[in-house]
Amino acid sequence: MEKDVVSLQDALEHGLTAEEFQKIQEILGRIPNSTELGIFSAMWSEHCSYKNSVLKLKTLPTSSDKLLAKAGEENAGAMDIGDGLAVVFKIESHNHPTAVEPYQGAATGVGGIMRDIFTMGARPIVSLNSLRFGNPDEPRNKYLLSRAVKGIGDYGNSLGIAVSGGELFIDECFSKNPLVNAMTVGIVRHDQMASATTGGQVGNAVYIVGATTGRDGIHGASFASKDLSKESESKRSAVQVGDPFMEKLLMEASLEAIQKGLLIGIQDMGAAGISCATSEMSAKGKTGMKIDLDLVPFRETGMNAYEVMLSESQERMLVVPKKGKESELVSIFEKWNLNAVRIGEVTADGFIEIYMGGKLKAHIPAESLVLGGGAPRYERETKRPSYLDAVKTWKPNSILDITPGANTKDVLLNILSSWNVCSRKPITEQYDSEVGLVKLIGPGLDGGLSSIPDTNKALATATDCNSRYTYLDPYKGAQFAVCEAARNVYVTGATPYGVTNNLNFANPYIPENYYMFSECIRGMGDACRFLGLPVTGGNVSFYNESPEGPIFPTPTIGMVGILQDKKKFLSNFPKEVGIELAVLGNFRPSLGGSEYLKKIHGQVNGSIPEIDIKEELELCKLILSLNEKGALKSARDLSLGGIGIALSKTILFSGLGIDAELIAFKQSRLDLTLFGESSTTVLVGFDSSWKEKIREQTEEKGLKFYPVGKTTSSELLKLKDIGVEVSFSELNGPYEKGLEVVFAL
């Protein structure tokens, strides 16, 4: 055994605590060497071990009769969708790498989540991304956003995977710490699902396949587990470098090997690289592995064991083939011009045994390294932030109301131009949403809807979180995120199936931050339980803060749903003249946390909209029932920007006009009526012959029917009772120009 003895100071510099260093010595029965310390530091980092979050995550609902792979069991969640098929999906972050090197940081985030899907045997069919950036008027933020979007587009387009949707949210708190959350969804037959395990098959060979190994990404896992600082800019070596064309070859070769039944197990080498893949596969299979690092294909010379074990070079997999299938495995990967090299074997003793240069470099129990095994687990101290009570003292009468006529029109156009409302075309046009011929409802609308190849089914997808809401009220804000994601799925006509989450928070050792995290988990869990939605997995990203302060808490919700008959999909907007419009649900608007309050008055304040999850469930059932009966022509979520923005976007997407009267929506203030935001509300379109039946069925559910008006051929938004008339061109100008400056050549 190599004995370059390390000290407590070395451990602290690797991000371990004194207590953790002591625990490592107890596990090994000795002081670790430098390679072993590096392995423990990566595997016990927040990024890999979830040590400060796993106890909270265990409170989330994870049960469903449709589940095929529960949270934490595999690389991604898997759910039965009928006919022998499963949907496989997951969301993950690449926040800190994007802050340092936005193009590669965002691109490799896409690559990593793609590998999580196809290592399970599923072919990715759509991807989404949820982005948070600072004000693009500032040059650095503009650079980060534009380069991140290009990285996402270039990588995904090269793989040939359609983008079905996503979201962008802009706020100053994300200036030094942007968020890039990437989600991928794939489809697989039940009998072709793969697992990240050795399968207990002692003596089987272990192969590394795909790209060569270099020094890129070393310390990537630990880099993602620290606060961003002024020195972070120098940590570019911790950012991985991606090759999407290599990933495409790796995907095809891996899927071919899986479909031909050659493999016992397969694992992506993402965070912590070989360290993670060997330990996780071994622990799951209750075995060990003996690995010779001299056999690893290198792209750089002079790498030592520490560097090889911690390298996060992209587009690599660790596979355990079935005995007798090794040559066939190698032939497949060689056909795709990829490496497939035997580097070791599965052992019975449960230890990860690493050799290089003929010397034993590491000897560690696999179970001691992994989440759910020997990795530490903590529940941190919480303290309710004092500002949460202060913001609730804000009253709408502290700001001037808008007045009917020109003032209202000006405010409407101003909100339409805001970063969080305006057109996403400058972003979505960089993504290929048509590849694979699966798009039914594309990016830029409430939720995406894509055909599932060779079936009559369609897949609905959405990502959602209003970061201002969770900042103002973490419990209700997280509930709102779950409900809005579900709403954006069911307005396509699809039934919500399951949730994946990306929990973006600040330093968990600060009690106020951990309180926000805990409350968001509680809110998310309560909402998912009531809606009957299992949480199938996801990602936790702590330490999202800079010297200027923490980000807003952002528990991004990824949602999938299934429409059994894709011919019954619902449009986001009406397509004919004379269609009746109404809002179904319970309109309880609030200006607290609204886009109006931020854009027009420069404030993030107040109480966020009330939310009743029982009503949300009833509204979901109502929309799905009405659609099944053929009663609806369109449906869209009513949230950011209120009824005023929802009607404006309906005109912009349909090219029609709307004659509306908002008497049924009238509140004590005009700004509250037009721009107040509400949960549990959907704007629907229908033929007039259905009006009374829809009203009756809505009221039977304990919900309300709010008549709006009709579509016209005028291309005008007429709010008759408010005295506002706005043309398509007047709406379109500010809406389209909002993000153009960011992506202008």
Curated annotation (Swiss-Prot):
Coiled-coil intervals, chain numbering: none
Keywords attached to this entry: ATP-binding, Cytoplasm, Ligase, Magnesium, Metal-binding, Nucleotide-binding, Purine biosynthesis
Top-level taxon: Bacteria
Subcellular location: Cytoplasm
Residues that hold Mg(2+) 2 according to the record: D116, D268
KW Transmembrane (keyword) present: no
Molecular function GO terms recorded: ATP binding; magnesium ion binding; phosphoribosylformylglycinamidine synthase activity
Listed InterPro entries: PRibForGlyAmidine_synth_PurL, PurL_linker, PurM-like_C_dom, PurM-like_C_sf, PurM-like_N, PurM-like_N_sf
Active site: residue positions: H47, H94
Swiss-Prot/TrEMBL GO biological process terms: 'de novo' IMP biosynthetic process
Residues that bind ATP: Y50, K90, N501, G538
Transmembrane segments: none
Enzyme nomenclature, EC number: 6.3.5.3
Metabolic or biological pathway: Purine metabolism; IMP biosynthesis via de novo pathway; 5-amino-1-(5-phospho-D-ribosyl)imidazole from N(2)-formyl-N(1)-(5-phospho-D-ribosyl)glycinamide: step 1/2
Residues noted as binding Mg(2+) 1 in the record, renumbered to the chain: E92, N539
Binding sites annotated in the UniProt record for substrate: S93, H94, N95, H96, R115, Q240, E312, S313, Q314, S541
GO CC annotations, alphabetized: cytoplasm
SUBUNIT field: Monomer. Part of the FGAM synthase complex composed of 1 PurL, 1 PurQ and 2 PurS subunits.
Function: Part of the phosphoribosylformylglycinamidine synthase complex involved in the purines biosynthetic pathway. Catalyzes the ATP-dependent conversion of formylglycinamide ribonucleotide (FGAR) and glutamine to yield formylglycinamidine ribonucleotide (FGAM) and glutamate. The FGAM synthase complex is composed of three subunits. PurQ produces an ammonia molecule by converting glutamine to glutamate. PurL transfers the ammonia molecule to FGAR to form FGAM in an ATP-dependent manner.
Family as reported in the entry's similarity comment: Belongs to the FGAMS family.
Protein name, per record: Phosphoribosylformylglycinamidine synthase subunit PurL
Gene: purL
